[in-house]
């Protein structure tokens, strides 16, 4: 059990989504005093403000600056900057894509604080694993050089959500301390032998009564794959993934298997393009099940359409991963 309020910090949460970074930090017992967040998704912002009512909304990252924050000290900057430009599943245009250039907004804010004599001591950034290999590694090298030129000492690791939750989701995390920081403790690596969480199975909620499906739905037995950002307007994608366990035969109309040989199932995305098999019938996972697969409390995104809930959860960071990293940052 973490000691409550052992640390008190001011946080700037960029590309904040539904608050996965802030929730993970809060779960360690760290107290967030001044709390700022920035995102342009009005639906995600609605969820964020509901769950963190004392946080200050800043709007687009392009409006965030030392002056905008009135010179407020920031102890930790977090950001899962847009990953579509670097995603293996996307077009991988990188910095040619407008979304890819938003990293430079992070660098601008860091430099702004440095120039005003209040450098942000810690940064924690997240992106898809594909960032490492994009453009023959030049994209990652550029990001690394920009941050080190700003005098941040960096640590990086690809972390898999499956070490914490039954979802196979690999993400690159970049942690930096300004001027090397005052702590000699390394944040990375984290791994199976370093975490205090167990990959518990996620119970399927209730039963499905839609789309002709009836009956109680069984628990997931294995590990789901990645919740990712896709267009919800492609409902047919639910049939492009493997749907049946390898231990069972593909029935009439089936398209494959539900789980891999190692118990890992295939990809969930923001359109909920993942299914559960029951008596040779299929249904999508519910938003609550997706919340559990990302480590959020049940109902974290409720009050909005399922379309928005799937999108928000697919774009979110996995909460227990952030919690594990934060425990290393603050030596908890």
Give, region by region, the residue ranges found by the protein language model:
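Exposed boundary/loop context
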Residues: 10-13, 17, 72-73, 83, ...
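Class I SAM-dependent DNA methyltransferase catalytic core
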Residues: 2-6, 28, 150, 156, ...
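Core alpha/beta nucleotide-donor-binding catalytic domains of modification enzymes
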Residues: 2-120, 128-133, 138-141
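Conserved Class I SAM-dependent methyltransferase catalytic core
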Residues: 101-178, 182-185
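Short glycine/proline-rich turn/loop motifs
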Residues: 84-89, 124, 300-307
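Membrane-targeting and insertion segments and their boundary/processing signals
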Residues: 22, 80, 117, 121, ...
